[in-house]
Amino acid sequence: MNLRPGLNVGAWRLRNYTTWNYNHANNDNNNPTTQQWNTIYTYAQRNIAPLRALLTLGDGNSPADIFDSTSFRGVQLATDDDMLPESLKGYAPVVRGIARSNAQVIIRQNGYIIYQSYVSPGAFEIKDMYSTGGSGDLNVTIKESDGSEQHLIVPYASLPVLQREGAIKYSLTSAQYRSYNSSVEKNYFSQATGIYGLPWGATIYSGGQFSSSYQSLALGVGKNFGDFGAISVDATQAWSKPKEMDKSTGRSWRIRYSKNLVNTGTNFSIAGYRYSTSGFYTLNEIFDTYQDTSFYPLTERKKNRAELIVNQNLGDSAGSLSLSLINEQYWNTDRRMSSLGLSYSNSWDSISYSLNYSYNRNSIPSSRFSNEHHSEVTRTSGRIYNNDQILSFNVSLPLDRWLSNTYATYSVNSSKKGNTTHTAGLNGTLLEDNNLSWGVQETYGTKGQGNGASVNTDWKAPYGEVTAGYSYDKYGNTLNYGVQGGVLIHEDGITVGQTLGETSILVKAPGARNVGVNNQTGVKTDWRGYALVPYASPYRKNTISLTTETLPDDVDLVLTSQTTVPTRGAVARVNYKANVGQRVLMTLLHNGSISVPFGATVNVNGGEQAAIVGDNGQVYLSGLADKGILFVKWGNSSDKQCTVRYVLSKINSSKQSNVVLTSSDCN
């Protein structure tokens, strides 16, 4: 069981994640019944808008942009990029120029217009251009008022560490080390990092980590070289004292590169290499040696790591190709880890398919290896190298011609060991809101390995989510089921819904029961008119629209769409006014048979909202109670005002499309 309770008080967000595990006794294996509670994290957090940062008190993780991320229990202040508008997020160079007159500035990248604006005569700077996430020079056209043009080229390429000119990103952490292993000592440490965007497409970054057993300093620089790509280089110097070992000093160098070859459609999304000397350790590695139970030796330390991720667009209708490669070597051991992934994907009409290949090579000391069934291994220098290769093909075919919202899937996987498995399945959604998803799969293995089948369902309901499934294979049968959801206690009562995300929205529409929310599968208002919308975007406009087709016959909404901008972790509320009652198209007559003039206003029971009389004295009124008073006015004099005292059940009327048609005298 997973519990994620939380409390919002003003700008503060208190969060907790606790699990409960229960294992029933197995008499065959003499295993006793056990139960255990585990707290995964507890923290209080709030945003500090002037600093564009989040303050965290309790459990958290340090940023991973300069040092490896470290789990902690303490205090951290770190910038939150989501607080920036979209036009200032990510990296984009500053575009500078001089306009001779009132001019239009047009910026193109790879032939596409990505920015347009108008500037006054004189020097100008454009700093609010959206980050494109790729590379390719920016072609700037300054179109003067007389029709003449200036043309500039601004180099552009990006890496995750790059910042806009003048932008700063920082973090300050002071805490205890928090390990998943309870026997590891809770050593204190402090960490500070900073990244600053310089002119000319450069970024400088630095950081430090400090504790009694470990200190490190890092310094790096990144540069946007335009057509030549983006490069960052950094170095880290570390002084460490592992438990029951001598002091050690080492350093680590890292280089990263990104480049988009527009003409060939090739994108090097990341290419990196890190080299560390034999005396270099990370903060996590040192802290993990300080265990209460026994000595934790550092026998395998990374010497170097190379990684490459390449994406290749093969052109129209030809699909795309991607390659990922990782290789690691270690000090004091001949261990080597290699991983290669190659995939091709494409679609034809509505059929999508892909071909994938993976190769993984890893090793363990031969003293740990005793499984006689692992035949595909290489024994070298006292180590066992396991070489695993898998080739797979996948295809997905929509069956809308015969079964709506249904897909047929097929995949085949073949490994170097000779095992081949075939899996065929059907997947789809049911119900009016497509909130019941289902899947059926059958698997066949050529050597009897992997033979089996499974059935799974997932129902997203207004009050939570229910999952259930059944599977079998040669090892046995498995039945799984689960229920998850969210409960919100607020000033108006209790609202139950689907699992709450980090940031959520409470819909308040009293009287509008069982009304759906657009683009929210299974989300509907409860019997009081309240609903929970999970997973809202913090610091962004979230538009919540109620589905008018699901409104009850006796309910109308004054507004059907609202926009809110919640902070991170908030539960924002959007209010809707629902008119509950009859929908009436009433013809108003005064002086016996004269229609009330066009444009007259009608107030129900003296309320603030007014309806307008149309042609032939007709007025549409929603949410009308069974009886009441209508105040009609088309002038200030008494002869241009009248009232209608109505009782819908006692007047002659007819009904058409859930609208009551009637006439009333206005006296």
Task: Give the predicted meaning of each segment.
Residues 119-136, 531-534:
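Short acidic/polar hinge/loop motifs at secondary-structure boundaries
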Residues 101-102, 120-121, 133-136, 197, ...:
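Short, well-ordered loop/turn elements at secondary-structure boundaries
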Residues 1-104, 108-119, 143, 148-153, ...:
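Flexible, glycine-rich linker and terminal segments associated
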Residues 122-124, 211-214, 238, 328:
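Short acidic loop-to-helix transition motifs that present clustered carboxylates
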Residues 172-181, 186, 190-208, 216-219, ...:
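Core alpha-helical transmembrane segments of integral membrane proteins
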Residues 184-188, 196, 200, 212-215, ...:
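Conserved structured core elements
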Residues 32-33, 131, 183:
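Short consensus segments that form the blades of beta-propeller domains
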